A protein has these predicted regions:
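Short aromatic-enriched loop/helix-cap "lid" or pocket-rim segments at secondary-structure transitions
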Residues: 41-42, 143-149, 154, 211-218
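Active-site catalytic motif of lipid deacylating hydrolases and related acyltransferases
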Residues: 23-98
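Bacterial N-terminal signal peptides
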Residues: 9-16
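Catalytic metal-binding/acid-base residues of hydrolase active sites
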Residues: 33, 106, 137-139, 205-208, ...
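Serine-dependent carboxylesterase/thioesterase catalytic core
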Residues: 27, 79-185
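Sec/Tat signal peptide C-region and signal peptidase I cleavage site
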Residues: 18-22
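Bacterial N-terminal signal peptides that target proteins for export
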Residues: 1-8
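C-terminal catalytic-base region of ester-bond hydrolases, centering on the histidine
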Residues: 192-288
Length: 288
């Protein structure tokens, strides 16, 4: 009898260990507005990507997405491209769990997939594997700066590096347009059904651009200065591109920058860079 009990215990332990071993987690980094062909270097940069990779048991289970996010979020070159790359990633790496980290408008494209499972036959499997989306500075309720670009005012040329020039993704991020999309096509905002997986916002609250402030230099001083200028056309709480109310409009707020960065703020450029411990925050969350 004792032998049988021992055998059963060993069998249970073996099953438990093999089950735990079989759980494979992957992380996908999804860029914001722009037509990316090398987002690793051009959008995120190596320090950010490799810092996030540190959270994975298998460091090969990381995907840096490259798609044309100058298009409307539902376009085959935007959500269709993203769905294709995520599907291939899940299949080739044999993933059980998928964590997606988005920046800016990338959160809208991901939210389109999560909100519209019947739009594309690939969406349901992605949603099934999706554990959570960590949305860095998402433009969930749009930005007045998109309205400014479409209106063709004097700031259009100054915003080109940040947003683009009158493309469909910029049109989509106008405040009124995003309000309509949120009411009719997207889940996760106030008064709408919840998203099928956690959508957690990281909110940038300010811009520091002082010449003698070390905070201003992370991610590039000139970018910080540019965001300080654009912040003048936004509410008092913004990262220079996205107002806090927009960044926190969908899902739930994971944290506001200063709560986890030792008091440093994350402007809209810094929230995609290895600034103020952000890669470690994300990596530790993946491990958790």
């Amino acid at each position: 009898m004792q032998r049988i009990k021992r055998a059963l215990s060993l069998l249970s332990l073996t099953v438990a260990c093999s089950t735990a071993h079989a759980t494979v987690t992957g992380v996908a980094l999804v860029h914001g507005t722009g037509n990316q062909t090398n987002a690793y270097s051009d959008y995120w940069q190596a320090d950010m990507v490799e810092g996030v990779r540190n959270g994975l048991t298998d460091r090969n289970n990381l995907l840096v997405v490259n798609c044309d996010f100058t298009q409307y979020m539902w376009d085959s070159r935007a959500a269709g491209c993203l769905a294709g790359q995520l599907t291939s990633f899940i299949q080739t790496r044999h993933l059980d769990r998928l964590i997606v980290i988005t920046h800016s408008n990338g959160g809208n494209v991901m939210r389109w997939i999560m909100s519209n499972p019947t739009w594309d036959a690939r969406y349901p499997a992605i949603i099934q594997h999706l554990v959570k989306v960590d949305a860095l500075a998402p433009s969930s309720a749009g930005t007045p700066l998109a309205d400014a670009v479409i209106a063709g005012n004097v700031f259009e040329s100054a915003l080109g590096w940040l947003l683009g020039y009158k493309n469909d993704a910029v049109r989509q991020q106008q405040v009124g347009w995003m309000a309509t999309y949120n009411q009719q096509y997207l889940l996760g905002t106030a008064g709408r059904p919840a998203l099928p997986a956690a959508f957690r916002d990281v909110v940038g609250t300010d811009v520091v651009s002082g010449l003698f402030s070390s905070q201003a230099y992370c991610g590039g001083y000139t970018n910080s200065v540019g965001l300080e200028i654009t912040q003048n056309w936004l509410s008092s709480c913004s990262d220079g591109f996205i107002e806090c109310s927009s960044a926190s409009a969908a899902g739930t707020v994971w944290f506001r920058d200063t709560q986890k960065t030792g008091g440093s703020v994350l402007n809209h450029n810094q929230s995609r860079r290895a600034c103020f411990g952000l890669p470690s925050i994300l990596a530790n969350d993946i491990k958790g």
